[in-house]
Amino acid sequence: MERRSRRKSRRNGRSTAGKAAATQPAKSPGAQLWLFPSAAGLHRALLRRVEVTRQLCCSPGRLAVLERGGAGVQVHQLLAGSGGARTPKCIKLGKNMKIHSVDQGAEHMLILSSDGKPFEYDNYSMKHLRFESILQEKKIIQITCGDYHSLALSKGGELFAWGQNLHGQLGVGRKFPSTTTPQIVEHLAGVPLAQISAGEAHSMALSMSGNIYSWGKNECGQLGLGHTESKDDPSLIEGLDNQKVEFVACGGSHSALLTQDGLLFTFGAGKHGQLGHNSTQNELRPCLVAELVGYRVTQIACGRWHTLAYVSDLGKVFSFGSGKDGQLGNGGTRDQLMPLPVKVSSSEELKLESHTSEKELIMIAGGNQSILLWIKKENSYVNLKRTIPTLNEGTVKRWIADVETKRWQSTKREIQEIFSSPACLTGSFLRKRRTTEMMPVYLDLNKARNIFKELTQKDWITNMITTCLKDNLLKRLPFHSPPQEALEIFFLLPECPMMHISNNWESLVVPFAKVVCKMSDQSSLVLEEYWATLQESTFSKLVQMFKTAVICQLDYWDESAEENGNVQALLEMLKKLHRVNQVKCQLPESIFQVDELLHRLNFFVEVCRRYLWKMTVDASENVQCCVIFSHFPFIFNNLSKIKLLHTDTLLKIESKKHKAYLRSAAIEEERESEFALRPTFDLTVRRNHLIEDVLNQLSQFENEDLRKELWVSFSGEIGYDLGGVKKEFFYCLFAEMIQPEYGMFMYPEGASCMWFPVKPKFEKKRYFFFGVLCGLSLFNCNVANLPFPLALFKKLLDQMPSLEDLKELSPDLGKNLQTLLDDEGDNFEEVFYIHFNVHWDRNDTNLIPNGSSITVNQTNKRDYVSKYINYIFNDSVKAVYEEFRRGFYKMCDEDIIKLFHPEELKDVIVGNTDYDWKTFEKNARYEPGYNSSHPTIVMFWKAFHKLTLEEKKKFLVFLTGTDRLQMKDLNNMKITFCCPESWNERDPIRALTCFSVLFLPKYSTMETVEEALQEAINNNRGFG
């Protein structure tokens, strides 16, 4: 029978190995097998065992066969003219070891055991080639071989590569030309991979999101990147019009992609027509195989120079490319430039029963060989696309139900596998992508939130997940991996409730922040772009996660290097989020502020570190390892910034005192004739010549004197300056200098705000001194009534004033310009009839050359308004403003001033008048002899609350030296009542302004109290 079958085959011309036709399959109801080119002996041998065949694998000159049970691999030599009838060699693993799958290269074979261990063999000697045990510690789920390199995908989602690397086909850079030690492809770390494939010297990986990465040899464009330069790191293939790819196949120097919609794309070498484009040209990018458009391709395979495609609806296999050995099944050995159906004879096309659901086609191509296997699905052909473990709703329900059952240990292993792997966790929550959908993020975060919420209902699962995140996943976060989908684990983790448990801040949140801080700028930008898409509530929750961690760290702050590193990472993380918020303006600044800093931060240490950091470019290692909180000003509320400013002032003053002391000691010791340095900056002024005296003395002092402690005395008055005299000094001085009658500033429209004049009546130096005085007031922790608009404080911080600032300075003008901007009428020019010239501060000027003849219209009106604002706030006052700024920053540290926002800076310089008189009464303190219910005190408060606002402000001047409050005093307005026993009702009320102490005689009548209070208000100046 066997001999007759062979003869019959010869007569029909279908058995010779070099011929094109396939061996006719036996009429088996169970399975059918076709070989192209035909090899009668091999065909018969395979067909007899087809029902138990688990895998067939081709490579140039060899066919490997794996049967059910996985006891061993049979390797057949495919030699021309042999018919493939030689006795195959058999490879077996160790005792009791089963084989799952096999793949072959040009000279090596890779065998994967059922328990996920890979073994490599030499194809000639069949000897086991041992490599280091790194893969023996992993469970491998997929393997693939190039000619001289291998890839392996682990269950944890890690991709390993080893072998030849002359063209970068390992994807690990060009560190070595080859290696026998498997290397992790770091570039794809964290990417949930679905499939891997290898060609002659190039490699490809398909992610679960449908993205394809390629690397290695590229002389024919087989990487699909649009050029022919080889790549030693995986690169994303683009230009697929958002098609989701479901399968990739690598030929020798060409590649093929199959999408979820059944479209076939090919690229790379086209010399033999293996791309199917009716051309022999190479393609550098994925190109659709037009001949198959309209059909749904369901399976593809690539040989060395040919390609196969199966259209299940038709029951036909199409082939194209090299037909040198008859591998196309076209009845000959000619090349085929476009897809044509495979034939089983010269006149009969292969036609499978496409309607059946019981059978499936297995299509194998390798070298110059094609194999078609039509078998029952129940035959259990090897699954070559085993995927990494992922999580879904069904898995969660099973986990919860498995507690203390026989499956419990298995369940715990599953939890550990998924929550220890960034790729597995990310792959669990991928969104389905439609072909027309553009999605920067492929995650279904709502699904993730729901599953996490369900999981955390069980404490044992919560604890186990926390342990997995801490011990494994966070240590494997892919900060080196540039693909965006590798970074999606960073989007996912903050959704995990364990990250928001306060006890986990050090074990989970800090490591997360440290990894993000190690990212490249490109990867960091991807994260920030994602954060910018978050809803307000989600974004706020993310900010709070890191802010809470900072607060928790401050609770245990001991200045150790580790804690400095922790806080540095957390603050850098908040800095990134704050940068995103500045663009989005989604959350108020207060969300980022850590109020606890005010009481937990050592401000003296903080200021000293700032000095050390500024003193040298190459800061000492000790300074570098210490976090400087004020480098992250967004975490400081205004009170903390003020405290930092005042601490800086105090240290400067103490430094000057110490320097003066050392100088005095040296002079005394050496009996030198030099003058000793004064430890203070002393001003003696006359009330009726206040401005004159101040300016004269300022011009005589050295710059170094200005930053000493200020002591002020008024001529002819007795008053030791412990703060109160300074307050009154600045109050009176600025009150005179800002008066419209004095002429130093202009008040547009008689408004309450003042601005610099276009043509000042004083020399520029006076504005310099005014800036010095403003800085001197701030340096000495004082507030002053300076009715500048917010625009001034913006300019001090190098920010541009806006139309809103002009509305504050000149309400009428601002309103008119707004009306101009809002008007969209067609008769705009007739209604407004204005030109690019302006009248401001009694001066006319052109905003642009020849502006008086250029009409403002709908097209240029925004430019007109912009130039108008710029003229008022910048161009018209440039000279005098620059002098003011120079004087101000001569006194104040610009770096610290720029920690403030404009509104905050205005509050700290100008103070506040948001009085709360009820709180003022509530905060009152009483020395012995008085209490809140004492008749005199009751009468005093009754009389006080009857006063007008202006009278109350005058009383504050009498009590404190100023009518303005610092930010820190808004809720702490205090007055201390003292009862001098020797005083009687004829004595007036007196005040110790430095300490807000009121000496109040025990008046017995309401009339006496009111008279005494009025006398104090009307005589609220002077000391002694």
Swiss-Prot record:
Alphabetical list of CDD domains matching this protein: HECTc
Any Gene Ontology biological process: protein ubiquitination
Repeat (RCC1) residue spans along the chain: 96-155, 156-208, 209-260, 262-312, 314-364
EC category: transferase
Induction: By IFNB1/IFN-beta. In endothelial cells, by TNF, IL1B/interleukin-1B and by bacterial lipopolysaccharides (LPS), hardly induced in other cells of the vascular wall such as primary smooth muscle cells and fibroblasts. By viral infection.
Tissues expressing this chain: Expressed in testis and to a lesser degree in brain, ovary and placenta. Found in most tissues at low levels.
Domain HECT: 702-1024
Effect of residue 994 to A: Loss of activity; no effect on IRF3 interaction
Entry's Gene Ontology cellular component terms: cytoplasm; cytosol; perinuclear region of cytoplasm
EC identifiers of the protein: 2.3.2.-
Biased composition (Basic residues): 1-13
Main location per the UniProt record: cytoplasm
Taxonomy, superkingdom: Eukaryota
Location within or outside the cell: Cytoplasm, Perinuclear region; Cytoplasm
Post-translational changes noted in the entry: ISGylated.
MF term (GO), any: ubiquitin-protein transferase activity
Region span, Disordered: 1-28
Active site: 994
Function, as annotated: Major E3 ligase for ISG15 conjugation. Acts as a positive regulator of innate antiviral response in cells induced by interferon. Functions as part of the ISGylation machinery that recognizes target proteins in a broad and relatively non-specific manner. Catalyzes ISGylation of IRF3 which results in sustained activation, it attenuates IRF3-PIN1 interaction, which antagonizes IRF3 ubiquitination and degradation, and boosts the antiviral response. (Microbial infection) Functions as an E3 ligase for ISGylation of hepatitis B virus protein X leading to enhanced viral replication due to increased interferon resistance.
Subunit composition and interactions: (Microbial infection) Interacts with human cytomegalovirus protein UL26; this interaction inhibits global protein ISGylation. (Microbial infection) Interacts with Kaposi's sarcoma-associated herpesvirus protein v-IRF1; this interaction inhibits global protein ISGylation.
Protein name: E3 ISG15--protein ligase HERC5
Source organism per UniProt: Homo sapiens
